[in-house]
């Protein structure tokens, strides 16, 4: 017997949301391992605040995280290896970090994909300036996505499923085609969606390695001596 469920509404997803729903589907099926870390960034925040006071610049904390990730991955490049077929791994020498950058579009803020190429060869200042330049530049068409990729992600179901299966197959056949678009490592954060709260961030990613940054929060420290 069907019970009454009460009134409900049906809403159409915007094109942007449809694209991201299908893009996240590209990470399936993936054999993922998740790890939760808590890192003390007190000194880093203090140093950035000091530099901002000296220069008057708005420095990017994301740039600091990107530098740290790039240097760590450069020491263990196997974590950004990609399977080619079923019997070969491709190891990339450069750490190319794919991240989403908040872009001001009129009165709205939109997320746009960007890849910091060769991040392991760049300084904090270089990555910071690259991120700020992307934020200041006029928003590119399709939020930086190739036109063909956007069209595939907006295809009606079940065509979208077929296209995603073909993209996954091509990525396994030639991982360089995917890495050229999304980077070898993914970096994302809760950002503007989680202000005022603390917690963890978990997100699916098509990349072999992804870092999702939660939120900075004050916490009592025990067993720490001050000189």
Each predicted region: which residue ranges?
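C-terminal catalytic/motor cores of large multi-domain enzyme assemblies
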Residues: 1-227
